[in-house]
Amino acid sequence: MTTVLPGAGLPKSFSARAELRARVLSAEEERRLRGHGALVSDFRQQKLEREARRNWDLFYKRNRTRFFKDRHWTAREFGELRACRQFEDQKLTILEAGCGVGNCLFPLLEEDPNIFAYACDFSPRAVEYVKQNPLYDPGRCRVFQCDLTCDDLLDHVPPESVDVVLLIFVLSAIHPEKMPLVLQNICKVLKPGKRVLFRDYGLYDHAMLRFKAGSKLGENFYVRQDGTRSYFFTDGFLARLFTEAGCEEVLSTYVFRETVNEKEGLRAPRVFLQSTFQKPLRSAASGPRGRVPHPGPS
């Protein structure tokens, strides 16, 4: 099965872009997908949007720091964290947008002493959990609360000062209509020629197929029982978002995994989309614009 997005209104080079092949559904999975039914009412959708921050804050209140496992795979999966250096011990400045309670942040800081990190999250409670972590060192990490769809990152991060932006399982939690605002925001702090590393839920992931009727908000967009939302990406949709934000696609691939529960005899096919995008270089004559820079990391 190949997912194809219409190319109307897109640059010619993008319209000709070959789509990746999505996971092929079984007959039972297709039946389950058809059972998702009608969309959630506009009234409830607007309420979910208004209460998005509250719902994520309640999520972290319930689960504290226990829900997600530490992501020790980030440096292994994204070779760009090594490749973007000109020499081995070069210091890197990264931004983790949507850091949660630090499951990706702290393993990276532990593994690489030459990283300084900015990190932000929608949830004030998640930010406090990061600051309370024994591994939190203000000399190596600056964490702050931020709604990436409306709060200006330049209030916290100097313009064009970041070598790598991590977008790991965060964009899916944002309404698709507001995703372009997030990308415009992060591009302001990313250096020209540097990259965004993305990983998130892919089309037909097991989590998507598990939703029941009354959960569908839009195409590939769903709400969980706790009010948090999740979008399931195609590579074409993601490439269009970044292209329209002025970035160039470097690499995109679907990552297919299987979660096995031997005790229950269950096998769950997982689908993630992993991609890299680059902010184009610009002429040396045009300097960065923005706020007065903060003191840089030492």
What are these regions (language model features)?
Residues 1-54, 58:
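N-terminal auxiliary segments of SAM/dcSAM-dependent transferases
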Residues 67-92, 103, 107:
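Conserved alpha-helix/loop element of class I SAM-dependent methyltransferases that forms part
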Residues 180-195:
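A short glycine-rich, Lys/Arg-flanked "PGG" loop and its adjoining helix->strand segment in the class I
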